[in-house]
From Swiss-Prot:
Keywords: 4Fe-4S, ATP-binding, Chlorophyll biosynthesis, Iron, Iron-sulfur, Metal-binding, Nucleotide-binding, Oxidoreductase, Photosynthesis. This is Light-independent protochlorophyllide reductase subunit N. Protochlorophyllide reductase is composed of three subunits; ChlL, ChlN and ChlB. Forms a heterotetramer of two ChlB and two ChlN subunits. The lineage of its organism: Bacteria, Bacillati, Cyanobacteriota, Cyanophyceae, Synechococcales. The keyword Nuclease does not apply. Gene3D superfamilies: Nitrogenase molybdenum iron protein domain.
């Protein structure tokens, strides 16, 4: 692992739960519905995060666990069956129904896998019913997508055909752009997972080479590998450096000539560096502290350090998959401090001690830190923003330059007022 310093920490955490991933997954697969089996708090979280009013009939909902369910006085499975039947009668366009576990449903031991099997047999031919956990008891919010994709892998058809599979949700325009680049390189068969329709799953087999677009798909990658696919080792496509190496990993796997790869990528790289320049001027030399939440922390640290000139104080990660993160770790500066796990109070003490120019953290910590005069960037914004690929490098840098620019404006106004 390069020259980084790895420490482990345990204690109280401050993270969103996996239910949050429903917000981008339901937009990605409009023919799917996500039914959370949880509390009113779960319902409020999803609705608030998605910014969708319930009367707009979004493609997610919550089967509320009442006090009788939590006390074991009611049969939660009977209630769930009733809710599902009512939902499918009212929304016949649903093609895939995900039963999503939550902290409350896991605490009272509702077996959603058994419920999914039972309901699938009842609605066979009409809708596919799957389940996964969105609980935040031991996971971070991005792992919800990992659970959903893992549930879909067994349904993927088998194929011996040689193809490239991009695994992990990408913004549609970004995905289209990346596919165009791969097509120009001569890789004609490029599929995406998850697909834009839940029923149109790509086939998979020994001829499939997988590029992970997101660093939090540990279980999904394992399932794809078990189906015979090859997981390509590469940094993640954040920034120019990571995106170039990511694309080159696929080109090497498909034996594409280096001259063609260079000719295809060099114009994109030149344009991206030009677009990055004004943001590098704002970010260079600034101190950065990343608190653990999204699992994007290491690729972001690599980009902000290597391409934007920021100084890394600490890179916190919820957990570290050394095999998956190996290529990223090799690119980090020497002596980068990486902390796996979280004791939020101790980490906040270190933030205050070093007083960084920018802290990347969860929404729950942002306002208190801002009140102490420390600029922050919400880590959840990285998941909702189109930041992948060479073309998006400047947009990614702008996300981090924006709070620093805002702080400069506020400081100027304060001085003028004085």
């Amino acid at each position: 692992m390069s020259g980084s310093t790895l420490l482990k920490e345990t204690g109280p955490r401050e993270v969103f739960c996996g239910l949050t991933s429903i917000v981008w997954l339901h937009r990605r697969m409009p023919d799917a519905f996500f039914l959370v089996v949880g509390s009113r708090t779960c319902a409020h979280l999803i609705q608030s995060a998605a910014g969708v009013m319930i009367f707009a009939e979004p493609r997610f909902g919550t089967a509320i666990l009442e006090e009788r369910d939590l006390a074991g006085l009611a049969d939660a499975h009977e209630e769930l069956d009733r809710v599902v039947k009512s939902l499918l009668k009212r929304r016949p366009e649903i093609r895939t129904l995900f039963l999503v576990g939550s902290c409350p449903s896991e605490v009272i031991k509702i077996d959603l896998s058994r419920a999914a099997e039972r309901l699938s047999s009842q609605f066979n031919g009409q809708v596919r019913i799957l389940n996964y956990s969105g609980s935040g008891i031991e996971t971070t919010f991005t792992q919800g997508e990992d659970g959903a994709l893992k549930a879909l892998v067994p349904l993927m058809p088998s194929s011996q055909e040689e193809q490239l599979l991009l695994a992990g949700t990408l913004a549609n325009p970004v995905e289209d752009r990346l596919k165009t680049i791969f097509n120009r390189l001569g890789i004609q068969k490029v599929e995406s997972f998850p697909p834009r329709e839940s029923t149109k799953l790509p086939a998979i087999g020994p001829g499939t080479k997988v590029l992970l677009a997101q660093p939090y798909l540990t279980d999904t990658a394992r399932e794809l590998k078990d189906r015979g696919a090859e997981i390509l080792q590469a940094p993640f496509p954040l920034g120019v450096e990571g995106s170039q190496l990511w694309i080159e990993a696929a080109a090497n796997a498909f034996k594409i000539k280096k001259t063609l790869v260079d000719a295809t990528l060099e114009p994109l790289i030149t344009r991206a560096h030009k677009a990055l320049k004004p943001y590098v001027e704002q970010l260079s030399g600034k101190k950065l502290f990343l608190l653990p939440e999204s699992q994007l922390e290491i690729p972001l640290a690599r980009f902000l350090s290597n391409e934007c000139g920021m100084k890394l104080i600490e890179v916190g990660v919820p957990y570290l998959n050394r095999e998956m993160m190996g290529p990223e770790l090799d690119l980090l500066p020497q002596n980068t401090r990486i902390v796996e796990g979280q004791h939020v109070e101790k980490q906040l003490d270190r933030v205050r001690e070093h007083h960084p120019d920018l802290v990347v953290c969860g929404m729950g910590l942002a306002n208190p830190l801002e009140a102490e005069g420390i600029s922050t960037k919400w880590s959840i914004e990285m998941v909702f923003s189109p930041i992948h690929g060479i073309d998006q490098a400047s947009d990614l840098a702008e996300l981090f330059a924006r709070p620093l620019h805002r702080q400069n404006l506020l400081n100027k106004k304060t001085l003028e007022a004085v």
